Amino acid sequence: VSGPADAAATTSTLGGATGAADGDAPVLRAAPRDGVLTSIAAATSATAASDDLVGFAASACRAPLAESWLVGGASTTGANDLIELANPGSVPATVQLSVYGSQGVSTPPSGQNIVIAAGERRIVPLAGLLLGEESPVVRVVSSGAPVHAALQTSVTRVLLPGGVEQVAPTAKADTRLVMPGVQVIATAAGQAGTVLRLLAPGADATATVALIPVDAVTPAPASFDIPLTAGLPTSVDLTGNTAGAYTVEVSATAPVVGATWSTTGFGQGADFAWYAAAPEIADPSVVAVAPGSGASVVLAADAGDASVTLTPVEGG
């Protein structure tokens, strides 16, 4: 948890999960100070090490939303993905889950009118919404109260665990997406180690994709255009680029949502990450770094040069 020393943040837990998940979800609250919202942030991480589940996952605390998008995961053989819905408010929420896949958008019965009581959470298996989908995108719409949505995803390849991740939600579709710090690794021929997933939910679009090396030394590959059909997710293999860290930028002619998947490999001990589109930081903000080794902050300027000051926060 990071924030002012006098923020007086309080922590509670949500219960009531149903499905293949155990434990409670923490909720962090901080009251306004002198009529001004308190800047506070929190993050957590977990490491799995069992016969069928191996990997590291980190997640930041986020405010609940009336609408959000989950770009990531799969419902094919070997995938075990769970949609987590949490209602930290004081009144019930009713949630609708719409899934975009290779046949377009659908709202299956198991995704309709999901009631989440105040202070409770629900777990919905992704495979129960749309089975056999390689590149799904889920739209989460809540009425009555905003909810926090996330996607817990893991994969097993022929009995070999391939990693775990907690996919963060995207607040809305936009004509510009920025995904900083995406890792591109060298893989064997025919193995897609870094994949960008895009969806234009409302109208056909053309997306221009640019990869900008974080180290400013690696030559930047040429940008390229991707045609997007409304309502159909599109996956783009980025593996052929020089190994390293990149900022993935997407500019589109219509609002889109997207995220980038990257794996450390396909053998024993492999893990993966989903890089959701990062929110724009226009005002002073607080960032909490989840426990883990080798953590770094990656920033990307939207247009032109920018000067950023990073100041350690007491207790952060």
Predicted segments — roles?
Residues 85-107, 142-143, 192-219, 251-252, ...:
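Short acidic, flexible loop segments centered on an aromatic residue
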